[in-house]
Amino acid sequence: MAPPRCPAGLALLLLLLGACGFFQSYAVEVDVKDASNFTCLYAQWMMKFLIKYETNSSDYKNASLDLTSTVTHNGSICGSDTQAALLAVQFGDGHSWSINFTKNNETYRAEFITFTYNTNDTAVFPDARRQGPVTIVVKDAMHPIQLNNVFVCHHTTSLEAENVTQIFWNVTMQPFVQNGTISKKESRCYADTPTAAPTVLPTVANVTTASTTISPAPTTAPKPAENPVTGNYSLKTGNKTCLLATVGLQLNISQDKPLLINIDPKTTHADGTCGNTSATLKLNDGNRTLIDFTFIVNASASVQKFYLREVNVTLLNYQNGSVILSADNNNLSKWDASLGNSYMCRKEQTLEINENLQVHTFNLWVQPFLVKENKFSIAEECFADSDLNFLIPVAVGMALGFLIILVFISYIIGRRKSRTGYQSV
């Protein structure tokens, strides 16, 4: 199969951020036949998986799992009025994915997606601590589709659960096919419909979007973009809030030519996991920008503290789901505060993800552990916010003043010695 081509409208952005085809996935086409050799379930789509896994050194790494050129569909079922239809595929070294469909007299809908990845696949999961298959089940949010209509969605959609992000695009799917013929009637996803909001890239300084045309950024540094809007995010375990975060986020991409991207809270969905010693906040801005923040408790310290250990950023092509840029730093030690307290920093801070990507934060207030009554606990402020911050210029000024006085005294003493020498002659 020939490598996928980049959409023309995004060619420039891909050129700025990396080679087009750096991350690739194969299209899947499954045609399930019934006992009479008639098509009963048809699907063609593209998908990929972003997976965070633990290594033997207790660090976390991010893996990108793509479909291979060889995919089987063993176990797929046509379905009936009393039995769900099942679309199942197997690929790579022990990986599998399936989705089941149910119907009534008028409509059909997807119910559950089951994804199994095999951490024994060392090419994808090097040094994985957990060995063997890992299975997650996600409830699909697909709205009911009229029977004998084919579901079509070219735009990118994603599902996040248990450290796995599933990304889909270019989907054409019809279960319960009647008379063995794929329907000509289409039911489009909301993102594909003409009445939907126009597809735009995230807010990017010096990049203008008109339809799908992107103007080039200047060769100099980008003009300062407006500070990002501050968003409020939270995670729950059951009915109890377990993580709170308030922050404005801006990405600074310096690969080849600089770009600034503001994260829009209105289009950003928060997900993640809470735990006693680690917590992860996953932010998804319109299926275009994925940012994961992982917090760790330092239990070895005399006073237990939490801190930001890892940040992972992924930029997706909204048109076809391909990865434009992926960067990770799992060796951070930022935003530390005593366990049970919160961390606050109103001033701008910068997180270095790699040589090409920075994350700027504004109006930050975060508490990833021991949240009580859905409220932030006592805040420990960063040094930039503290009242002692003014002492730095004062101390520098005093040191310079002392140095000037010392030089002046040395000059006076030197002149006196000079005069004494002249008198003795």
Swiss-Prot record:
GO BP term (any one): autophagosome maturation
Organism the protein comes from: Gallus gallus (Chicken)
Membrane topology designation: Single-pass type I membrane protein
Region spans: Important for binding and subsequent lysosomal degradation of target proteins: 416-419
Name this polypeptide is given: Lysosome-associated membrane glycoprotein 2
Function: Lysosomal membrane glycoprotein which plays an important role in lysosome biogenesis, lysosomal pH regulation and autophagy. Plays an important role in chaperone-mediated autophagy, a process that mediates lysosomal degradation of proteins in response to various stresses and as part of the normal turnover of proteins with a long biological half-live. In the chaperone-mediated autophagy, acts downstream of chaperones, such as HSPA8/HSC70, which recognize and bind substrate proteins and mediate their recruitment to lysosomes, where target proteins bind LAMP2.
First lumenal domain: region residues: 28-192
PANTHER family linked: LYSOSOME-ASSOCIATED MEMBRANE GLYCOPROTEIN (PTHR11506), LYSOSOME-ASSOCIATED MEMBRANE GLYCOPROTEIN 5 (PTHR11506:SF35)
Keyword terms: Autophagy, Cell membrane, Cytoplasmic vesicle, Disulfide bond, Endosome, Glycoprotein, Lysosome, Membrane, Signal, Transmembrane, Transmembrane helix
Glycosylation, residue list: 37, 56, 62, 74, 100, 105, 120, 163, 170, 179, 206, 232, 239, 252, 276, 287, 298, 312, 320, 331
Gene Ontology terms for molecular function: ion channel inhibitor activity
Region Hinge, residue ranges: 193-238
Tagged with keyword Cell membrane: yes
